[in-house]
Structure formats: C-alpha cells, structure tokens
From Swiss-Prot:
Any Gene Ontology biological process: photorespiration
Pathway info: One-carbon metabolism; tetrahydrofolate interconversion
Species for this entry: Arabidopsis thaliana (Mouse-ear cress)
Gene: FOLD1
Protein name as it appears in the record: Bifunctional protein FolD 1, mitochondrial
Lineage: Eukaryota, Viridiplantae, Streptophyta, Embryophyta, Tracheophyta
Entry function: Catalyzes the oxidation of 5,10-methylenetetrahydrofolate to 5,10-methenyltetrahydrofolate and then the hydrolysis of 5,10-methenyltetrahydrofolate to 10-formyltetrahydrofolate.
Amino acid sequence: MLMIARKALASAHTKAFRLATRDVHCFSSILVSPPLVSLDLPENWIPYSDPPPPVSFETEQKTVVIDGNVIAEEIRTKIISEVGKMKKAVGKVPGLAVVLVGEQRDSQTYVRNKIKACEETGIKSVLAELPEDCTEGQIISVLRKFNEDTSIHGILVQLPLPQHLNESKILNMVRLEKDVDGFHPLNVGNLAMRGREPLFVSCTPKGCVELLIRTGVEIAGKNAVVIGRSNIVGLPMSLLLQRHDATVSTVHAFTKDPEHITRKADIVIAAAGIPNLVRGSWLKPGAVVIDVGTTPVEDSSCEFGYRLVGDVCYEEALGVASAITPVPGGVGPMTITMLLCNTLEAAKRIFL
C-alpha cells in the first residue's frame, strides 16, 4: 500500500510539473500582449532629504498621461463577456479565493477592491480572514481547503504577511494550477527559462506590459530600467521585459549612480516603494515611465487620512517623459484586472 501511495504521489507531482512546463499559456482575445517568447539583503533605499534643482530642457516634452482605469475597463468588459459565455456553456463561473491575515489598512483596501472587481465581472469570490497572530498551520489548513475545492480556480494570499509567518512556505502551499498571483517558484522559474512557459505571470508586471503595448510603446530592442527587485514586481518585471526582447537593467539599493543608469532608459519601471525616489533629472527626455509605487502618506485633507504617492516625482516627470502613469489610477487598476484575467484562464483550462 505504501508503494502504491508513493507512486500516486509521484504521478501527481509529474502531472503538475508537466502542466507547468508545457505551452499552456492560453492568450485569449482579452489581452493584446503577445505570447511569451541571493536577493536576501535588505533594500535600504535612501530618499532625497531635499529636492534637487528643477530640470530644464531646450524643448519641453509633451507628456501623455496613461489612464489605467480606462484601459482596465476595456479589458474587464471582455472578461464579463467571457465569463457569460462560460456560464452559458458549462453552467459554471471562475472562482477566486482570497486569504487576508491581520488588519493592515492598505491590505484591507486592496482586498476590498479585488472582491468588488470580481462581483462586477461575474467571478465568484470567497474571502478567508485570519487574525494577525494566526499560525502557519491555520493558514495552510485554509489553503488546503481551497486547493481541494473544485469551485475555486484561483487562490490569492494577500501580502505582506505578519513577520512571524514564513511567506515562502505559505505561498508554496498554493496549488500550481491555482497560483493566479504567479508567485509559485515553478511559475517564476519557467518565466526565467527559454523554452518554458509559466502557467501564470505575476499580475503587476503583466499589467505594466499590457499598458505599454496598448499605449503603442515598442518594447523590443529598447533599453528598459526596472527600479527595484522584489519577488512580487521587480524580478518578474525584468524577466517579462526580456521575454519581450527589451535590453533590461535593474537598479536597486546597492546600485552605484542609479540616476546615470536610469537616464539611459527608453522605458522606466519604478517599483522600489520609495515615494518620489525618481526625480525629473533621472529621466531621459522622451522616456516612457510606468510608476508602480503606491506608498500611503499621511494627509489629513484626504478622506481616509492618507494619500497614495508613487516612486516617481510626477510633477518633475511631466514635460520630460513622453508618457507616464499617474498614482493612483495607473498601474493599480491593471494589477487587479490581470488577476481577473488569470482567474478566468485558470477556469478555462478546466472547463474549455
């Protein structure tokens, strides 16, 4: 019996591996992106204490503001149509499970927006909330339940987790075919390797590329700089841009003269999480800037007592960049929309 159980387990692992490595990245008509052709040291960025002098150029660049809300809405309209077709064909809809630990204000806001987006597009959503002091065992128990639930096609663990929890161990518990956040090591690894295709690409990088393409920005052959190298955005962003044939440089907290390197870029992806880190003087005139940063900064004049600030000094970038995403209203809506797309694709692999 033990031998049979071991063979069954080996067979299951083999099946999961084959799923991860074969070409199953099903691009529907929803997105315009084409098919995909030690970092443990702390990132201690040192932001400017005083703003640098204003940058002036002989001719001021007219900057296009890339509206992520409009582009996200176009994609969501198609998602609604696809979900409707699925429901009519098989009587089922995609299902997304979200695990939220603790009561961190920004995490609650992000989860609330994701649940709302599911409701608006016809995707079923289930929210599991656990206390700040919960154990890894409690979270893993919830994940196992969702892994076995056939009505759930995507599972998302809202990050960051409390410090006493092993983030890698918890994320690795999500079944590969339900890893709609694209954080599983096999998904990231297959993104990095030629001849391999991940089941899912991380939502924020995927949304950034979609924004670039829909704005008419050519990626192939361009010099791109990614500022930040987190597992969530920076690292997969660099890998994805390489898949689109960009020449990619990564700038991080240990980079010498980051301004000089960034100023060579045709495309700048700012994902360091440091408000106003990238000044106008960092940018090459005509560069396209995608600002991933969304740091909450206290502001009593705002409804919730804070406002979101990007990594790029927006006012200084205007007139230098040829195009830029605002914060908020740029990358954020696209990240959630790519989560919906990944959940839909996960369900399609089961039903269609």
